[in-house]
Regions:
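Acidic, serine/threonine-rich low-complexity disordered tracts
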Residues: 1-168
């Protein structure tokens, strides 16, 4: 879908601002998809740095939000940092995926990543020389399962889910 085109999603729960495209998931869909125990392990690659794995686990949740803990590991599973806990509302999680219509295109794409095969909504946001691409798995509400950032066409950062544990 080109920026500025009328989106197919008509539910108000997906559109947080009139000048933004609909988000891939509503706050309620994220809540349902991120019960305690939901864990995502993602391989992070940053230009000029060693690869590492970022682990995010939902610890608890209620009608308003969730507490999660996150830490980093080596690709072999050795812990690099201690878990840090944070709490966000479900709406705050949703707001991370709210993107300006004037800078963003939405498409559909199937991806094969180490965490599995997913039918995704692909959001591509262009800001000057920066292109950020987010792949949100329809069967895995919450954070993107894959993310890439390019500057002047060069890949400078990526995060790819290597494991997606549903929890609950």
């Amino acid at each position: 879908m080109r920026a500025g085109a009328e989106p197919d999603v008509t539910a108000d729960a997906h559109r947080l601002r009139p000048d933004h495209l609909p988000t891939p998931f509503s706050a309620d869909e994220i809540r349902a998809g991120c019960p305690p125990g939901r864990t995502i392990r993602s391989l992070v690659v940053r230009a000029g740095s060693e690869r590492y794995v970022r682990v995010t686990r939902f610890v608890s949740g209620d009608a308003d939000g969730a507490e999660q803990e996150s830490w980093t590991e080596t690709p072999d599973g050795d812990r690099l940092t201690e878990p840090e806990r944070s709490r966000s509302t479900w709406l705050e999680y949703q707001e991370h995926a709210s993107m300006p219509a004037a800078e963003t295109e939405i498409g559909e794409e199937e991806i094969d990543i180490p965490a599995g095969r997913f039918a995704c909504l692909r959001y591509t946001r262009i800001e000057g020389d920066s292109v950020s691409t987010f792949w949100f798995g329809g069967s895995a509400p919450g954070q993107p399962l894959k993310f890439e950032q390019r500057m002047k066409g060069e890949l400078v950062f990526s995060s790819t889910a290597i494991e997606n544990i549903p929890g609950g």
